[in-house]
Each structure stands twice: as structure tokens, then as C-alpha cells.
Amino acid sequence: MSGTRRPASWWLPRTVVALRVRVFEKVNGDRVVTLPNAAHGPEVFERVYAHPAVNGRSAGAGLSDLFWYWLAPGSEVHQEHLEPGERYEEVAATTRRILAGSSAGLAEAAGRAVADVLDTVPLDRVSLVRLRDLLMPAWAAFAYELVFRRPCPPHARDLITAHADDVITALKCTGLRHPRRRARLTAYLGERIAAGDVPHRLPASLSPSEQALYLQGTFFNTAVVQLSEATAHVLLALARHPRVQHRLSEHPDDDRYLAHVIDETLRLYPLFGIAHRITTGEVPLDDTTVLPAGSVVCFSYPDYQATGHERPDEFDPDRWSDPAARRAPYIPFGVAANRPCPAWRASPIVLRVAVREVLSRFRLDSTASHTRSNPHRAPCLLIPRPLIPGGRRLEALRRFVRLRDGVEDVTRGVRQLVLGTVMVLHARRLRPAARYFEEPPSGRCPVAHPTESKTSRERNG
């Protein structure tokens, strides 16, 4: 299959795409710069991203209201959205402790979780699945074991999966959020903390209810969603590139080539689309332009990682065999100078395990489109290794996947426009981030344990 990606708007009317983009541009306001752009290339992106004054996370950005709305409850204690200070440092240290562990231990836990899910897939026929949906329960169980250091019970796995799916569905504007569904996980985590079931020392600056929200946001939202998305991207890329898949299947212990496949996938389909920061001081953009304090800087990962590579739109894992590729723009886990992903070490380890586990059991095939956002949740045919399906049946299934994908693209695009507009307007009305930072300092001291009020309940959805 060709390495050229099909346009993201296949069958989708250009007017709908343009309208959707305009809706989200309105959220940012006027004091916004997106990097890289026509005037400022990847070198400016890197310099500004690493500038010490580009460290604001939520306060002062209209976009923060939307992200807090999507991620509620507990956005105010989510590690990604905490402002610099003692509270952030304590939360970040806790996350590092929970993620700490041997590579072998992480690999074993991930392999066990993925195998448990794959055991439910029949081996006597071809299965049509959505890869993100298939693997999200595995990463829910993996995250549970990280936090609680014990196997994940089915009830907890279902709660985590339902929560994570609700968050990512809202983020992609393919569905509205369901606060009650998320609240069930919050209540469960609160009960586990009260019972003393968490073997890690949780941040002392957080109240017990905030500790539950911290675990929910960092591990059972972000970790589960990002690992599910990453695995779906890698497997869908393999399904669409049979020669690459065949090479991996024939040489399952080739760590170097598998690393190249993962790198190429995360280069072409970065998990982060736009990361925004707020300047807390003046930041020079070029010789004549200085960004004032309070400016919102949006860092476009897809645009940045498309620079410095030959044939940037082509899926080519072999490009990473060239040492020069390592010097090209590529930051799958962010930049070291500005809060990189805390799972930068663990993620590649467990991703490799998951990919190998799937390929050891199934051959993958997909005619669905592949875009960075993957709103279709990665449709894919799983063909059990011992099975040799009839050519006509397999081709019929491939045609069905292609046709359904095209039809869904039209309806999904319109749905994203409508639901995205609804959520943008709702977030602007609620103003969860803005209202939080407008509260008197005594109501949101980074050390005190604020009591839940009507305002905070509304803020958390």
C-alpha cells in the first residue's frame, strides 16, 4: 500500500472543515502566536519553547477554559495544567515515583494487560475492530497496576475505560462529555484512598478529594488515553503498510527496527496537536518582535515535525537509519526544558511490548484513512495467524472498511462541527479556568485544602 496519506477531509465538504477551524480559532483570542509559521521556522519554535518565561499553563488563556472543560473534573490539580510552584513540584515528584520501576517490570505488566484483552478476540475468524477501543481496557488495567500495585479488578477497569473514552471522545468533538460517568471513577478512587489502598505517598498539599482527582487526571485519563492513541496509531500504520508489518513479524526481536517504526509513527502522527503556553514575561520572537507577558503561544507539533525531513508526508521507518534523522525536528514527548511527558521513559518500553503481543497473534489489514486525530478510532481487520481467509471474503471486508470510513467521514465531520461549537460555547459560558484564577487567593492556595463549593462543583462539570 502506498505510503502517501489520504487527505484528512476525504469526502468531507471543505466548507465544513473551514467552519470548524474558524470556530476553534475564535477561542484563542487576539494575543496568540502559533509556531512554527511562515515567518518563524523550527529554530524559533525550539528557542521559544525552551524560554524560561514561556511557563504559564492555564491562567490568562481562553483556550484553557476549553481544555479544563474537556478534562473535568479536577483540571485545577491536573499535572499538565498546574502553574509553576511548590504544588506542581510535589505533584510531579509523586508522578515520577509512581512511574518508577524496572524496564522488565513495566514490560511484564504491559504484556500481561494486553494479552488479557487479546485473549477475548476469537482465533477462528477475521475480526473487525477499532484499535483504540480494543486496547483502551488494557491500558486501563496497566495504569491501575501502576497506581495500586495489584491486579486491576474488572469493575475498576470498566470505570477507568468509560472515563478515558468519554474524555477523548469529547476532545475529538465526536460526542459530548458525561460528567456523571466521570464522577463514578472519582468516587471509586476516593474510596480507595480512604481505605489506604494506594501504596504511594500522595501529595500532602492536596486534600483527599484532590488526590483522587490528581490520580484520575494524570493516570486514568492522560496515561490511558495517550497509550491507547499511540498503540492505535502504530498498529494502524502497520495495517496500512504490509511490507513494514511483514518485516516486523519476521524479525520480532529486532528492537532497532521496531523503534524506527514507533519513531516514524509518532513523527507523522504526533500525540500532541497543539500545546499552548502563556508567557509570564517578555519573550523575544525575532530581532524586531517581542511577545509581551500574557501572550498565548501555540506550538504545533505536526507542523514542527514535518520540517527537516525528506518526503515528510510519507511513512518510512528506514529514514531513521540515517543518523541525520536524529537531528531533525522530533519531540514525541515534548522538550526537556518545558515539562516533557513524565512517561517519556516508560512509554516506548510498553509500546514495544504491546505491538509485539498483537503481531504475535494477528496479521493486520486496514483500508481506513489514517490521520493524526484518528477520530474513527482506527478500524482494522485482525486476521489470526493460523487462519488463511478466503480471498473474496477478505477483499469484501476491505471494501466494507473503506466504504464505511468514507460515509462516517461525512457524518462525523458535521457532528464534530456541531458538537464542537456546542462545547466551545458551553465552556465559554462556564469559564472554568478563568473563574478558578479569579477566586480570592484564600480559596485556591497552593498549599491549603479548599472545601468544595458550588463554584468548584460547577467548574468540575
For the regions a protein language model found, what residue spans apply to each?
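Cytochrome P450 heme-thiolate "Cys pocket" and heme-binding signature region
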Residues: 320-377
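Cytochrome P450 catalytic-core helices
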Residues: 224-251, 342-362
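Active-site substrate-recognition loop segments, prototypically the cytochrome P450 B′-helix/B-C loop
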Residues: 1-154, 453-457
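Conserved cytochrome P450 K-helix E-x-x-R motif and the immediately C-terminal K′/meander segment
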Residues: 252-289
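Cytochrome P450 heme-thiolate monooxygenase catalytic core
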Residues: 103-229, 431, 435-442, 446-452, ...
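Conserved cytochrome P450 K-helix/beta-meander segment immediately N-terminal to the heme-binding cysteine loop
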Residues: 300-324
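N-terminal targeting/anchor module and adjacent flexible "hinge" preceding the catalytic domain
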Residues: 1-40, 394-461
